[in-house]
Each structure stands twice: as structure tokens, then as C-alpha cells.
Amino acid sequence: MQKQKCSLKLYTNFLIANQNRYSGLELSRVSPVEDLCHDSVSRWLSSSNFTPSDLWNQVKSLVDVKTGYLLCDDTLLNKQYSRVNELAKKQYSGNEHGLVNGICLVNLLWTSEDEFIPVDYRIYRKEADDKTKNDHFQDMLIRAFGRGFSPLYVLIDSWYSSISNLKLVRKFS
């Protein structure tokens, strides 16, 4: 059996370093690994099962939980050309100003203003877990404070400014 060219360390470093384009094609283009192609990345991802805890274990040494800011926002990974993808569904995209087939990620990042490090995430699939994006935000914030985070500020998009979210932020201030 051929050794996998992609690895968790390579993929995590790619996600941290690349602030704009998160695709297997982009990783294969910028990778220091010789002959890493989009198909290799796709095979590796499909054979792997990662959790938010795996992400945290990879990045916690890069984060100073006593400083910086926590930033929460969601992003839609456009999958308009994907025929079969159980995570993708029609969702509103602010970038496209309309419905797009895609995967919605709710992300929690730590930033020191100079760098942005993802520390937690949730895949938004209300039909699978009956959770809203606000529920995911609250779960991630509670987990972050449980990990010892004490940010200067928690920065959120106005979509996350519900009374219950703001009370939770204030509770940890």
C-alpha cells in the first residue's frame, strides 16, 4: 500500500497559513510535498475522520489563551459542482447574494491581530443535530472558556448578537 502524501500536520499548517483558498487543489499547488495532487488530498480527507478536538490538539501550542481575541463567524464552502456530498445543501451565501449548494462551517478563531488560528469549528447541519448556528456558537464559546481562554474581546457577526449569546459573552467577561 502506498504511503499517504497528505498528513494532518501538513493539512493543518495549510489551513493556518492560507487565509483565502481552502481547497485540495490549492494545497496541492502550494505544498512542499512533491507530487501531491488534488486527488491525493481528497483520498486522504475521505479516509480520515477529524473532530474539533483534533484541531485543538494541533493548534493549542500556537495560542496564548490569556491574550488576544476570539472571533466567531460562519462561512459557506461552495460545492456547486459536487454531485453527491451529504454535508452540502442549498444555503444562502452572502458572497453570492443567493442560494448556493455548499457546506456551512461555524468557526471560532483566536487572533492576536497578527495571526488568525482556528481553535474550534462546527458543521452546520440542522437536520442532522437540530442545532442552530447560535447553538454552535454557544457550545464553542463554553468549550473555549473551559480550555482557559480569557480574551480581551469576543468578536461576532451581527447575526450572532442575540440576547442569549450576548449574555453568555458577558458571563465569561
Q: Where do the language-model regions lie?
A:
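Active-site-proximal, Lys/Arg-enriched surface segment
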Residues: 47-115, 125
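Gly/serine-rich nucleotide phosphate-binding loop at the start of the catalytic core
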Residues: 1-50
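Electropositive, glycine- and tryptophan-enriched low-complexity nucleic-acid-binding patches
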Residues: 37-43, 95-151
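A structural signal for short, well-ordered beta-strand segments and their strand-loop junctions
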Residues: 69-72, 118-120, 153-155
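Short, surface-exposed basic-aromatic patches at helix termini and helix-loop junctions that form
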Residues: 61, 146, 166-173
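A short acidic (Asp/Glu
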Residues: 81-83, 162-168
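Acidic, metal-coordinating catalytic cores used for nucleic-acid/nucleotide bond scission
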Residues: 155-162
